[in-house]
Structures are given as structure tokens and as C-alpha cells.
């Protein structure tokens, strides 16, 4: 029930944290050794800026006194953008069939008493890393397949009356860079997030190619017995321009934001190789915001690794005191 609002400093040393409790009272807590931020790529840079660490020019527009100028705070935001191809199928049952009325009740019974059936399925049944025609030696597109499908409309997702399967693809190494910045002194006001998706020619080209690769998979001989036509993008979407328009209207994030407090040794870097905030003592960051560039896959395991390394750094330094 606590909401961090500001890091407390003694000159260049982080010594505590100010937070708002569940009763909306402002409280403080002091630390004996150091503080580790693990707020993620959106809120770690926001808390730094609320505490006076960041681009001094931006902080002044918010009326926040600059404690330490770090130009890179909140910059370098990267994210995996995904696009779906939904295929109608026949002669097989999918989650679309098994999640309706009596079938859903049967599956609920199976799960409650036998831990079997529909409710034991993961979100995606199959995954693949593939090399596009633009790949430079290693896979550059990740694909997941789900035994269900729906049509995304302006009013949200619509569950069709017929069985479908879905392929979801993302370009693993996007070039586009965005930003995350505090937009108010109020710690409870969400930061301003600007992704700048599809901001480079290569990113545009790769997302169009991702749609084409997924379509080719569904047209493979192994799918011929169950293929019942494409739901999305649909037969009317054929040219690169039409595919790009479909991507711009339907692409989604995959919740892999990284890079907004990136590691490095240059003037734009926020943390050093030991995860310490540059120019500040007693403050580290251990989350996906420290990634210099997005990894070619899911970010979860890499985040766990960062947490483990942070623990090692703290333990090593503590034993040396």
C-alpha cells in the first residue's frame, strides 16, 4: 500500500526514501547501506526525476530542483512491437469452441477435479525464432502460436463464432527509440511514455515482413487440411502499403519495455557496470531499465539475472568493508 515519492539525499549520498502510505500520509524511511530501485522501465526513471536526478532542463520545467544532472534518464526506451495473423480453421476444435457455454463448464470441471483440460493451457502453445530475408546470421523475428483467435476492432477484441488460430510475431531488434519522463511533481501521476514505434525504415520493413512470414506458415502444406481462410489481415490486404496500414492500426506491445536507465560509461549512461547510479552514492537500479539495448527474446530471465548480479555486487562490497 506504499507509493514511493522521492529519494532522500545527503549531498551525493542516497540515505532514504519518502513514500505515501495507504492512508495518503507522507512518511520517510532511512537506509543503513544503500537503496536498490526495481520499479521497471517506466517508474525507475520517473522516481529519479522526482528526486532531482535527470535532465536539468526537463526538471526545471516541472519545478523540481536538480540534485544531479544525468541527461540519459528516461531516454532510450525500447519495446517489442507485435502483430497478429488470425487464421480460420476447420475439422478441428480450438479454444474458441471449448470456451463457450457447456464446453466451458466441462473444462472448468476437468480443471477443478483432475487438473486437465482447457484451463491448463498456456497462452501460447508453440514458439519459434526465425530468420527473415533481412537477418544477419541470427533470428530476427519471434513467433508464438495460440489455438484461439479473435478479431481486433475499434471497439476491442471480438470472439468469432468459428474456430481460429493465431500467430503473433515481433521484430526482435527494433531501432526506434522512445522516452519516459515525469510530467508532474505529483508522484501518483503516471509518467509520459512515448514509444516512437515504427520510427525507422528498417522497423517498418521488418514488421511488414513479419506479416508475410506468418502468412507463409499458414499456407504451408501441413495446414491445408484445416485452413479455412484468413480472418486478419484478410484477403483485401495484399500490398506492402496495405500491410503497413494494417500494422499501424493493429500492432500491440508485448510488455518488454527496457533501456530508460541504461548501463554504460558515456555521458548518456545512467548506471555503471555495477548497477550504481552514476554520480550518486548508495543507489543502484536492478530492473529492465538498465538494458543498453533490448534482448532478442523475452525479458523475464534477463531481469532475474540482473537481480542476481545486483545481489552479488552488494554482497561482495559488503564483505570487503
Regions of interest found by a model, annotated:
Residues 7-10, 17-108, 118:
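Glycine-rich loop(s) and the adjacent beta-strand/alpha-helix scaffold that form part
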Residues 16, 20, 90-93, 108-302, ...:
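FAD-dependent oxidoreductase catalytic-site/capping-region signature
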Residues 33-38, 46-49, 284, 293-296, ...:
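Conserved, well-structured core segments
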Residues 81-83, 306, 316:
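N-terminal low-complexity, intrinsically disordered patches enriched in charged
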Amino acid at each position: 500500500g506504499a507509493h514511493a515519492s522521492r529519494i532522500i539525499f545527503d549531498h551525493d549520498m542516497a540515505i532514504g526514501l519518502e513514500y505515501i502510505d495507504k492512508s495518503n500520509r507522507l512518511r520517510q524511511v532511512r537506509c543503513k547501506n544503500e537503496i536498490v530501485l526495481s520499479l521497471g522501465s517506466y517508474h525507475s526513471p520517473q522516481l529519479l526525476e522526482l528526486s532531482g536526478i535527470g535532465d536539468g532542463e526537463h526538471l526545471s520545467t516541472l519545478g523540481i530542483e536538480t540534485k544531479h544532472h544525468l541527461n540519459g534518464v528516461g531516454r532510450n526506451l525500447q519495446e517489442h512491437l507485435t502483430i497478429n495473423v488470425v487464421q480460420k480453421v476447420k475439422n478441428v476444435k480450438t479454444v474458441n469452441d471449448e470456451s463457450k457455454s457447456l464446453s466451458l463448464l466441462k473444462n472448468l470441471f476437468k480443471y477443478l477435479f483432475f487438473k486437465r483440460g482447457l484451463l491448463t493451457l498456456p497462452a501460447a502453445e508453440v514458439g519459434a525464432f526465425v530468420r527473415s530475408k533481412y537477418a544477419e546470421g541470427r533470428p530476427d523475428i519471434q513467433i508464438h502460436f495460440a489455438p484461439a483467435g479473435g478479431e481486433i476492432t475499434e471497439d476491442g477484441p471480438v470472439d468469432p463464432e468459428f474456430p481460429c488460430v493465431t500467430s503473433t510475431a515481433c521484430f526482435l531488434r527494433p531501432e526506434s527509440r522512445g522516452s519516459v519522463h515525469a510530467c508532474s511533481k505529483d508522484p501518483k501521476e503516471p509518467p509520459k511514455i512515448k514509444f516512437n514505434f515504427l520510427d525507422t525504415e528498417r522497423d517498418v520493413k521488418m514488421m511488414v515482413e513479419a506479416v508475410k512470414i506468418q502468412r507463409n506458415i499458414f499456407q504451408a502444406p501441413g495446414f491445408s487440411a484445416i485452413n479455412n481462410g484468413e480472418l486478419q489481415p484478410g484477403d483485401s490486404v495484399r500490398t506492402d502499403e496495405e500491410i503497413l496500414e494494417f500494422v499501424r492500426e493493429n500492432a500491440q506491445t508485448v510488455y518488454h519495455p527496457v533501456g530508460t536507465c541504461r548501463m554504460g560509461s558515456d555521458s548518456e549512461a545512467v548506471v555503471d557496470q555495477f548497477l550504481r547510479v552514476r554520480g550518486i552514492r548508495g543507489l543502484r537500479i536492478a530492473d529492465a531499465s538498465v538494458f543498453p539495448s533490448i534482448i532478442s527474446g523475452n525479458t523475464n530471465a534477463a531481469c532475474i539475472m540482473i537481480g542476481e548480479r545486483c545481489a552479488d555486487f552488494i554482497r561482495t562490497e559488503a564483505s570487503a568493508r
